[in-house]
Amino acid sequence: MKAHRAQHSIQLAVTQLEVTEAFYAGILELPVQRSLTAAGAPDHLMLDMDGIALVFVEEDDVVRAHPVLGNRFSMFPRGIGVTLHFEVKDIEDISDAITEEGLEILYPLEIKPYGIKEMWCFDPDGYLVVLDEALQNRKKAGS
């Protein structure tokens, strides 16, 4: 575990950290870490993306710390208007795991004409997640 030190961060409210961790770290194999928290601060997960941290906090903890947000969370479902893009490895295995878990797939895995394999799905909290993996024979621009 390490302390959250990113210069910029985006915080997403989730139902259960364990479920979120199982999806992002377990299925997507992204480097999600449980971060150290100050006394009294809520437990959270952090995904460092080149200096920008994606921070996952349980919704109940957010509402406890900021009661005024309780109404907002009840009016607007999680995930509305948010799309998370990740480059992953072994996208075929990930696609199979997402299907096995019964998570909703918006667009199944397909090869795109611009040199990637891509799929769109929803995470356990309803956030739209776009996954892609470069094709092995993809050429870099200018080569």
Predicted stretch roles:
Residues E18-E21, E92:
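Conserved active-site region of classical short-chain dehydrogenase/reductase
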Residues T20-A25, I98, G126:
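Conserved active-site tyrosine of GNAT-family acetyltransferases
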